[in-house]
Every structure is written in structure tokens, then in C-alpha cells.
Amino acid sequence: MRASIHNYIASCTQCARHNILRTKSPGHLKSIKLPSDVFQVLHMDFWGPVRTASTRGNRYVIILTDNLSKYVIADALPDCTAKSAAQFFIERFILHHGAPERLITDNGTHFNNHLLRAITSSMNIAHAFSVSYHPQTNGQVERFNATFAAQLAKYCDPEQSDWDLYLPSIVYAYNTSIHSIAKFTPYELAFARSPKSPFDSTSPILILPPAHIFYPYLQRTRRLITAKARTNILHHQSYWAQRYNQNRRDPVYRVGDLVYVQVSTDRTKLDARRLGPFIVIQTSGQQHYLVKDNLTGRTDWYHVNQLYPVIERHHYY
């Protein structure tokens, strides 16, 4: 009797779609594999739009963050089109630093399009997409977004018409500040040296040794600080993963399983918190699932913490 009552309640469709979950969201914390060197894995994202365009006509910021060094490149733009994203990626990164091995973006049309697909495929760049409404997948950029937006708000005028004038200075300050996790500045990790600040006093002329001596020294320095930063980051990831995963379910779904999907867009007080049931049609590891709505035929990728299992109701005769 107890088991049948428990199953009857757990399998209630309306309850599953509307109830507030009082437990931790499912899914263990799994970090993206840390690259061995800088500028191998990049994260790119758009921020905006601001309420009104600046006097220069800009409403968006496009941001590129290196996964290992945390080095940031950012520009203010009037739009968030595929053309703007592709032009920024080529002119501001590839023509300066070469092609990365992997690029991670969201699944918006400004990144998921024929133009950027042609660029990445021609340069042998693996282009990975974060799942819908799950910014944690592209968390490197999201963390910088939170940092620089607050700084822009403090410096721009009350009409917010000149915010883009301060963007380069804020990016420079970020790149030359010691990162709390890596314990080095992003600039130092990216280029194996500290930048000369505009406020530094004039120093005597530095005489460098011959290139055949200095270059091996520079390479050794890069290897040492990169290895140290990787150790610091991996230690931090391990520590927080252990804390996050404690007492947290890590469900695994299989193709054919029925699930509800968390509603992440605007909803009113009486709207369902989850939609479905939908069916899992493809898996990617243990955290990302391609889910299909059989009524509309629409498919989309979701993170495991956006899914809720459908409990089959037992029938007793």
C-alpha cells in the first residue's frame, strides 16, 4: 500500500510540472578539460543590448575569453549579427594570435550560422555550443560579463551614452589584475611578461641578450608560469566540485527516457515550471541530452539540471 501511494503521488503529471523543488538541482559539477596552453580554447559571447545606444551607436559588447589565462578581448558593437561576430573573431584574434583549437559559444544565430561555420571548418577549429538557457556552460565569459558590467555602470554618465568609451580601460584593468584562481594576471599568462603600466616611472634602457639565448629563456618562463597556473586552477576546480557535488543527485538518462524540461523563459505565477513529457533521443556524455517534443517535432539540447524524470504510474488490478 505504501509503495503504491508513493508511486501515485510521484507520477502525478500536474505535480511534476508545477511543484517547486526543495532539493538541490541534479547533476554534478564537471568542468571543461583545462587546455595545456593559452589560446587553445576560447569562449565567445555577446553582452547587451543596453537600453539606449551610445553616442557612437553601440548597444552590444562582444567578448572573447581564453580558457586558461582568462585573457579577455572585447569590443563595443552596434549589433549582434553573424557578420559582426565573424569579423571580430578574425580581425581581433586570429590575425593576432592564430587559430585556436576550440571555440565555445551559445547556440544563437549570431554564432550558429553558415558564415562562422565556414570559418571554423576551414581553419580546423572545433566549434562547441552551450545548451539553451544554461549560461554556466559558457561560464568563463559570463563571469567577466558580471565584472565589467558593474564597472561600466559606475563610470558612464547618467544617460549611459558614453559607456563604450570606458570599455577598453576596464578590459585592460581586468587583464592586468591578478586572477583570484590562477594567481597570475591574464596578461602575464598570455604573454609571459608583465605589461609596462602607463603610470610606471621611466626605467633605464633594457639591453636584452641575443635572441638565441633570450628565446629559450622566454619559453621556459612561459612553461613554468603556465604549469603553475594550471595547478592552481585544477586545485580550485577540484575543491569546488567536491563541495558542489556533496549530497547532490547525478542522474543518467538514456535514449527513450521521458523527461520534463525546466521553463527558463518568462513565465507568469500560474504557468508550469516544467514542460513535457518529452523524449530523450540523443546523449552527449552524462550531462547533455537532445530532447524531442513529439507534438511539435522540435528538438533542443539541455543540461541535466534542466531535466526532471517522468515517473511511470503503476496500475494495480
Can you name each region flagged by the protein language model?
Residues 1-21, 75, 84, 115-118, ...:
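Classical protein tyrosine phosphatase
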Residues 70-75, 128-130:
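Short small-residue beta-strand/loop micro-motif enriched in glycine and branched aliphatics
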Residues 12, 41, 99-100, 109-295, ...:
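Domain-scale segment recognizer with a strong primary affinity
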Residues 74-95:
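Active-site beta-loop-alpha junctions of metal-dependent nucleic acid enzymes
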Residues 1-39, 233-240:
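Amphipathic alpha-helical
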Residues 37-72, 266:
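An active-site-proximal beta-strand-loop segment
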Residues 27-30, 47-50, 58-60, 88-91, ...:
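Eukaryotic intrinsically disordered and solvent-exposed regulatory patches
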